[in-house]
Amino acid sequence: EEEALAELKNRNFELIICMPNMDNRDIFAAATEIKIHYPNIPIVVLTPFSKEVSKRIANEDLSAIDYVFSWLGNAELLLAIIKLIEDKMNAPDDTASVGVQIILLVEDSVRFYSSALPHLYKFVLEQSQMFAKEALNDHQRTLRMRGRPKIKLARTYEEAVRIFNQYRDN
């Protein structure tokens, strides 16, 4: 924990990915401490899928964790995590200024959304690239790539309703 805080003090990070293991290190307490000092840095827990880890995570305080993902061996999950966080940060401005659409994925199963999000992002990015090729110049191409639908993940019904109401006019 002290080592991570020292690194954060000396360097600029835009994302923290923690991987829990079954030793005595408490990444959840460390995440809470990091969030106190660096509240704007997203913290993601990337965990192997197992019953033991799932039970442990179910009993942890996840208030400092932005997302929990299950590592299923698909490297595209890392891109999906980055894009999901970018979408979370950019959606309010992009929907208000450019009218970007929102895709709302509602799912409470970590294992399922860890599997589905990489496929969803791959599809959306491929569609955006095809759409951008139709642009007349570089500026239009850039605007069309930025204008791809943003994906929002809701893990509870209440979160889904809140996101829906926030972006209902898009």
Predicted regions and their residues:
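Short, well-ordered amphipathic alpha-helices
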Residues: 30-31, 81-87, 116-128, 160
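Short, conserved catalytic or adaptor-binding loops enriched in Gly and charged residues
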Residues: 58-63, 139-146
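Conserved acidic segment of CheY-like receiver
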Residues: 1, 16, 100-111, 116, ...
